């Protein structure tokens, strides 16, 4: 340890001497301050700041440790000031002196943390300073006046009593100093003290806090945090953490007078089990057996040195082997035991804190933690305090979970998951263990809620992220960590699986958000997003989202059935003599679930598990409630393992080694796992040549090479040429097959071959066969092979074309020679033959509509204008075309578009062709029925001729049909002779036309969007299908309704 500078030592000693001292002449030997006591205290504070804090040294603190400043002077000053304050006699100068004492105590009592950035001189003097802090703590708690802590609390009462508007930075600083002093007193570890620690342990300080009003101050500050008092949230959280760490909620709330005796008995039993069996003075007679092994000698002496028991005695005398593990970051919490009075104080304080201060404090702290980029000590403090007070609320006689609602929500859950994720990344396993304990306690609290609807909502939010569930399942595979971490993992896993199982049974539509590898569909080269096949637009997107987000409990549970997870449970069970009974039950339930319910038997057929079960059944205490369940499980385990080994002898070898995932199905069922045929993934778009597919192969290669070079894919073409050259050098015959190396490895473009359809088409033209590689997750997923049927001459010819058009510029634009079309459209054209045939087929589908006449089979006037076919209505598109950017419209834009369409839409009748109402059964012919029909038609014609003999019936029908479908031209003269019914019908059509025009004008005025460049007179009613003629004017109200949209003329310009 470095020697302290003499100048510093002399200065500090002189300052402390001038501060004051005891007046031995008086009867009570009271402490008397010097004339410059306040200046002396300020000098000590300046020395601490200027020398220790700024220079990173500890010389001043070591000098103070050798004086009586903290042990005698400061406690005497605070005690005197407190007495004067209670009597109302304290002066402002004494108030400043007491505050200066507190400013010195806080840095001297600050916990010493050793890390990589701590200066060497501080590390060397850390033990000395910690011993000095223990002396300080003993002096402050054991002062005869028992009022030092009360004096510190009295210092901040004026600041707390002020309103938020009247409180300044000095008041906030005083409150922080007091809270830091409370934190420092709690943080000093009494385990490092030499000798007795009864006066400075947790029980002593809790009793002092209760008697001197510190707990009341903490309740007041916590209840006002956030809205009235700011700046003390994190220090107060740290104080609560130091108060409750290491304590067990169950022990605090379930205390019996005989419990200390039980604790001592348990400690003695543990010591006896771990103590090796050695020889005694009374066992030196009788026979002796000595075993020599690898140069070492082991002897057994005594009456028990018989052959059948010697080896067993050898094993008992051995110490259990210690497995060397990697050092873990952080310090594991040590259990702390407190007395009955301290348990009562902490229990009452915790209940009062939940009633008034928990929600305000935790909500303010959570908001502060959300601003932090990295997890620090404050995260651990938050998680420990959260777990403690949730446990307090669970163990109350009448729990009210509304008092802890600030930590049972999605925001607090995110803090827990963030601590686990970043803790795993930083290998801070202490943080991970604390977060697991907090998460488990949160699940238990949610399960205990009486309001099922609220609990179900909370669970749905907790389990929404599938990434978090996967991360929690992976924690059980960390079997190399200490037993404390593994116990927490087993505890959390048991609660999580039971909660998820019960929740999924009650809610079959539980969805979780899965992180997709691609956030959205990739756009094609034309800028349009690939259309979905089976369902239109948004409907198919919703189906995909639901299918991907639906939670499958069996799939989630199977993540736990891993080799490392079973190793973790074996590591926990191997310490069965030290475990509580609850851990034995949780482990057995998990193994039974895997072995019996999920039929994961082969994973448990391991030699270490076989030996473990045998030892547990033999050595578990008969009074243990889990002994019989383990015996039953072990019997079932052996009954299934022996027949399976006889059926599959390879299991006898597999019990020694870790199981290979690929062989699990065979070992379990005796059959090879069926290989799922992987569907070949083909693109929905293909490229075709505008000049036709009958052009020469050289012309196709020329167009493809020019197109690739135009797209700046020169390296891809060069790679292909080099590979073909190496192929020509390697191929010695015409029957060899080549699997060229993947382009992704050479060009560092992982999916060039997978996603470039033009390059794939070029490779296929050369003769390569492209197929998908199953279960390929890294790099290229395409297997490129060249069949042996492709001769060397073909390869040389293709290579020559590639080199020629790679170096020779072309006299055309490549994008005009090749285009991208949908694969199904191209296949449909290929299946339908030439264009003329397809046109004939379309014309056959659109046969004209015939009217009954005298001669039903007369089709001489088929080309007459009267018999023109009714134009076929264009199907309404259900898939929106997207913009060239390839990005889908947002929900807000789609809703805005639907509103605009609904406002600018009117309903008009629509005509149908008779083909729309003809079914397959109408093709059946019946001669007798036709004969009766024609006879009845002839009778009707005769009756009409008799009623009006001067009117030609066929001419009348002809005129009516033309008028109905608006085929009467403007110049055509219509006969004046018409019946009264025809006249009424024509007048009704004119009225309908006028009503439709007035309706369009009203809609145009009502939905005028205020475009400056558009005039409302330019609006006209147009059909969605611009190619369709005007709809029938004479349709009746019983016809189906079709919508028309009011469209601005300016839309056509866009």
UniProtKB/Swiss-Prot annotation:
Residues 823-838, 890-901, 928-953, 979-1017 have a biased composition (Basic and acidic residues). It is found in: Nucleus. GO terms for cellular component: replication fork protection complex. The keyword Nucleus applies. This is Topoisomerase 1-associated factor 1. Forms a fork protection complex (FPC) with CSM3 and which is required for chromosome segregation during meiosis and DNA damage repair. FPC coordinates leading and lagging strand synthesis and moves with the replication fork. FPC stabilizes replication forks in a configuration that is recognized by replication checkpoint sensors. Keywords: Cell cycle, DNA damage, DNA repair, DNA replication inhibitor, Meiosis, Nucleus. Its main location: nucleus. It comes from the Eukaryota. Residues 522-543, 823-846, 865-953, 968-1054 are annotated as: Disordered. The keyword DNA repair applies. Residues 877-887 have a biased composition (Basic residues). It holds the Pfam family TIMELESS. Component of the fork protection complex (FPC) consisting of TOF1 and CSM3. Belongs to the timeless family. The lineage of its organism: Eukaryota, Fungi, Dikarya, Ascomycota, Saccharomycotina.
